[in-house]
A protein has these predicted regions:
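Glycine-/Pro-rich loop/turn segments that contact NAD(P) or position catalytic residues
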Residues: 1-47
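Short-chain dehydrogenase/reductase
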Residues: 2-10, 55-63, 86, 90, ...
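Conserved beta-strand segments of alpha/beta enzyme cores
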Residues: 22-24, 47-49, 81, 107-109
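Residues that recognize and position ribonucleotide moieties
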Residues: 24, 41, 58, 89, ...
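Conserved beta-strand termini and adjacent loop/short-helix elements that scaffold enzyme active sites
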Residues: 26-29, 51, 111-113
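A short acidic, often aromatic-flanked loop/helix-cap motif at beta-alpha or helix-coil junctions
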Residues: 31-34, 56-57, 116-120
Length: 173
């Protein structure tokens, strides 16, 4: 993955492999709960602003990921496997805005920002330079497709469809 977090995750997986301890690697995509701040922003402003362009995210709920972890811990046949886990649908920020509008009961629009506009907005909000760089790098990764993969592995492991975006956002509203 080109996502800014990928090198740390890769290094962790390499250390686990080098340890010789039997393991299963769960590569969780984005958590739907990561969008709690977007709900608050949208409630206040009617806008979800980001520099992800039309990038897509196959997020899933913490419960979906936790259920998958329980399955691989409790069922035989998973040792040595690495699973790419994502939600059943890869959505864009227009879809996110519509889902947030549904859960808060008011209009919400997605405002696509350039990376520079996003950095300026984050700076105006008081974020430090390192955090701004991290957030805009995450959005660049999403814009580039780093979180768009959805192959059904998570749903197969948990034996049910993953939690739809709007249902994952509802408890956060």
């Amino acid at each position: 993955s080109d996502l800014v977090l990928a090198p740390e995750h890769k290094a962790t997986e390499e250390l686990i492999a080098a340890s010789g301890i039997p393991s299963v690697i769960l590569r969780n995509n984005w958590y739907t709960e990561n969008y709690a701040g977007d709900i608050a922003q949208a409630r206040e402003t009617g806008v979800v602003a980001a520099s992800v362009g039309d990038g897509r995210v196959a997020s899933a709920s913490r419960k979906d990921f936790a259920d998958a972890a329980a399955v691989v811990l409790l069922e035989d046949g998973h040792l040595g496997q690495a699973y790419e886990l994502g939600g059943g649908i890869a959505w864009n920020d227009d879809n996110l805005a519509a889902a947030i509008a549904e859960v808060i009961g008011g209009p919400v629009e997605y405002r696509a920002l350039t990376t520079e506009e996003h950095a300026e907005a984050l700076e105006s909000a008081g974020l430090d330079e390192r955090t701004i760089g991290f957030v805009t790098a995450l959005d660049a990764g999403i814009r580039g497709g780093a979180l768009a993969d959805t192959d059904g592995t998570l749903a197969r492991l948990i034996g049910r469809p993953t939690t739809p975006l709007v249902e994952g956002l509802r408890p956060l509203a």
